[in-house]
């Protein structure tokens, strides 16, 4: 049996990833303007991860350009 709390860093990373994905998806739906503000619940050590994942999801959710248009 593992120690109590040993999975907390993994859970924080997953939550940060989810927050970045949600922000990028809402931007894609035009529900929110693009912004790089860090949500208040993200720990300082997770800010670089949030910004990295936000850029990843922004690229992922970007509409594909149709050739010839």
UniProtKB/Swiss-Prot annotation:
What is this organism's lineage?
Bacteria, Pseudomonadati, Pseudomonadota, Gammaproteobacteria, Enterobacterales
Name the species this protein comes from: Escherichia coli O157:H7
Q: Which domain of life is it from?
A: Bacteria
This protein is called: Uncharacterized protein YibT
Q: Which gene encodes it?
A: yibT
């Amino acid at each position: 049996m593992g120690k109590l709390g040993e999975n907390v860093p993994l859970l924080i990373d997953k939550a940060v990833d989810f927050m970045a994905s949600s922000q990028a998806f809402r931007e894609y739906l035009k529900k929110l303007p693009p912004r790089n503000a860090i949500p208040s619940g993200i720990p300082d050590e997770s800010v670089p991860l949030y910004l990295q994942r936000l850029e990843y999801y922004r690229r992922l959710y970007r509409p594909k350009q149709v050739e010839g248009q």
